């Protein structure tokens, strides 16, 4: 099976072109190849498949084999792969207020519906950055889902490891719990991350993010991803943190997230209420995985 290793600011996945390759046990394969000692090493597996409703379809499997609805860093890499390998004909330009016009776009089917991505292409016809319309954030507790009351979950207290933390919950394709703090480096993420992910208030488990706001235009974040653990970056999580920062009057709607793997440009657009995520997509290497 041929594969391509790609990363978006350090959030790395193994990508398989299912126009040419067949994957029968994706969940099991994701667990094996994601192992950083005995496999290829990644945060998970992403399949690029034909779609009846969009240009292509992407399926995401976490390192533990569970299937995710969406991955903001992953979809950017899918867009780069599809364009550069000519798996689909690009559509027209994508224009987002306050950002450069993307000259070409693609529609990608995800577990969260069809998303439009704009391509920022260099003179060598290579995709350098991708702007993703992540859609409108979901704030209703039952739709995130979280077992908390109210129209929105904004800085509500929850008990974690014998203490109390204030959380703001958002779905940007998958569920996120955001916690603001003074210093993200002081958070024992290895300890508190799994406790939040598997908390009884989150029926589908949840991604946990700790955010240190620097000023109204930028914040630092660290992530514990559902099914993958600590990662260098989380694109959909960055979008959720942007929304949470706006809802709590900490940041502007256009801001930059600083993550361990790099930066993401975020825009919770007032006109259409959609969140736009812009960041790089990088091909690391190609390889062949043995049949057995």
Task: Say what each PLM segment does.
Residues 1-22, 132, 144, 149-170:
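N-terminal, positively charged, Ser/Thr/Ala/Gly-biased leader segments
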Residues 1-126, 177-292:
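A glycine-rich beta-to-alpha transition motif near the start of alpha/beta enzyme domains, typified by
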Residues 125-134:
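Short, solvent-exposed secondary-structure boundary/capping segments
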Residues 138:
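Ligand-binding beta-strand-loop-alpha-helix segment within the catalytic cores
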Residues 141-150, 286-291:
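Extended Gly/Ser/Thr-rich low-complexity repeat segments
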């Amino acid at each position: 099976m041929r594969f391509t290793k790609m990363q978006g600011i350090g959030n790395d996945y193994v990508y398989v072109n299912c126009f040419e390759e067949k994957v029968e046990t994706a969940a099991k394969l994701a667990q094996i190849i994601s192992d950083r000692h005995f496999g290829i090493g990644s945060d998970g597996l992403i399949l690029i498949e034909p779609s009846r409703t969009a240009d292509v379809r992407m399926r995401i499997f976490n390192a533990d084999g569970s299937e995710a609805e969406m991955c903001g860093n992953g979809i950017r890499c899918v867009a780069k792969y599809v364009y550069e390998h000519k798996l689909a004909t690009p559509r027209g330009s994508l224009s987002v207020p306050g950002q450069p016009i993307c000259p070409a776009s693609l529609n990608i089917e995800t577990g969260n519906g069809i998303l439009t991505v704009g391509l920022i292409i260099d003179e060598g016809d290579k995709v350098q950055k991708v702007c993703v319309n992540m859609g409108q954030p979901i704030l209703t507790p039952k739709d995130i889902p979280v077992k908390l009351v109210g129209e929105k979950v904004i800085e509500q207290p929850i008990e974690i490891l014998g203490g109390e933390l204030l959380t703001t919950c958002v779905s940007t394709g998958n569920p996120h719990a955001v916690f603001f703090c003074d210093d993200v480096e002081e958070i024992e993420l290895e300890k508190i991350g799994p406790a939040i992910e598997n908390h009884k208030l989150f029926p589908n488990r949840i991604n946990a993010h700790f955010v240190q706001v620097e000023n109204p235009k930028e914040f630092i974040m660290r992530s514990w991803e559902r099914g993958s653990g600590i990662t260098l970056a989380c694109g959909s999580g960055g979008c959720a943190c942007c929304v949470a920062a706006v809802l709590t009057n900490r940041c502007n709607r256009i801001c930059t997230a600083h993550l361990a793997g790099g930066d993401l440009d975020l825009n919770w657009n007032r006109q259409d209420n959609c969140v736009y995520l812009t960041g790089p997509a990088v091909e690391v290497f190609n390889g062949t995985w043995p049949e057995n």
